[in-house]
């Protein structure tokens, strides 16, 4: 298959690589869309020792299962591969699994390729009326969604009268702001130091955007 391979700081190569090997009940997925995470950029610039070259980056993935009983199912990928046996996993908190791995870090290659292999428990079927281009954003959106859900539980509130401040208007910050609104928080503010980003975010997102220095006012 073809893949975009990280070869070293600021070096990528589009080249032939071996097709994924299916282990056990893993599914082969033909990739449709992959997001570019901030961690991919850190790796590309050589700032992430956890991602040594050569390596296929990319973990925000959606695509279509191409073999087996689920062939044709459109899916989005949970990139976190947990052991399934430790206390965290059996408690439903596999994100805290001490043996967790993630695609785009050795030994798991990432999604900037034509195909990837994943276990069915790491796949969520995408509705027919939802684009795979949008579905690849499920993983970054889930970060903010999970944080909002935990915060609401800690406050013991449904959203009425709560005001929320999100520090940073990058991808995860915007996802958190949108998750706050979707979960019933009506007063949401985002602080962002970059003026161009502030101007962009002020258009039709349902939350207010200010510069950090304006908080003192």
Predicted regions and their residues:
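Cytochrome P450 core scaffold surrounding the K-helix E-X-X-R motif
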Residues: 39-45
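Residue-level recognition of beta-strand termini and adjacent short loop/turns
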Residues: 8-10, 23
């Amino acid at each position: 298959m073809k893949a975009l391979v990280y070869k070293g700081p600021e070096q990528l190569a589009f080249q032939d690589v071996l097709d994924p090997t299916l282990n056990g009940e893993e599914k082969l997925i033909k990739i449709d869309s992959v997001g570019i995470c901030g961690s991919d950029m850190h790796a590309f610039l050589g700032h992430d020792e956890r991602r040594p070259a050569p390596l296929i980056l990319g973990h925000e993935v959606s695509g279509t299962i191409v073999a087996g009983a689920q062939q044709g199912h459109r899916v989005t990928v949970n990139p976190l591969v947990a052991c399934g046996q430790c206390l965290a996993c059996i408690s439903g908190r596999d994100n805290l699994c001490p043996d967790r791995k993630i695609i785009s870090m050795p030994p798991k290659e990432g999604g900037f390729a034509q195909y990837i292999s994943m276990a069915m428990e790491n796949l969520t079927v995408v509705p027919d009326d939802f684009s795979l281009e949008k579905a690849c954003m499920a993983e970054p959106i889930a970060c903010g969604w999970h944080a909002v859900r935990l915060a609401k539980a800690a406050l013991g509130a449904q959203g009425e009268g709560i005001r929320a401040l999100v520090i940073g208007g990058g991808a995860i910050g915007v996802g958190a702001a949108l998750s706050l609104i979707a979960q019933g928080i009506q007063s949401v503010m985002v602080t962002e130091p970059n003026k161009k980003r502030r101007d962009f975010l002020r258009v039709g997102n349902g939350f207010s955007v200010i510069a950090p220095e304006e908080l003192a006012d």
